[in-house]
Amino acid sequence: MMKICFIYSNRAEYSELKPFIEYFQLNTITKVIDISKKIKKLENDLNLFKIYEECYKKFSKEKFDYICILGDRRELPFITLAAFYLDIKIIHIAAGDFSESNTIYDQYIRPMISIPSNFQICFSKESKKSVEKLFLSIPYLK
């Protein structure tokens, strides 16, 4: 049976992931990980490598087939890399979403998550075009 891990870091993310979680819980082994407490501890530390390290250990132990992440928070690239190096398939929800109100960091972080992801779920046609443009701009991914 397939094992999938949903990772979120705040209540709003959980609300958006909940329909996906409920769908997959019907047919798969599903784990939901709330990293919000870990993130709060690290905000003063600023060492985001600890998130990578923690996820790498957990993913190695649990042997997930997929991880599912949402959005563009600054800790997500570290989670993505842990899964990527363990050959766990990555599902990026809200891929390609760009907003004028987002900080410049968000505009860089989202593609950093989408590129190693195996699946990008876009919420709009504009987002889908952004993801397609991103992949066309990288010669070895064409």
Stretches with model-predicted labels:
Residues 88-142:
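Active-site-proximal region of nucleotide-activated glycan assembly enzymes
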Residues 2-61:
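Glycosyltransferase specificity loop/lid
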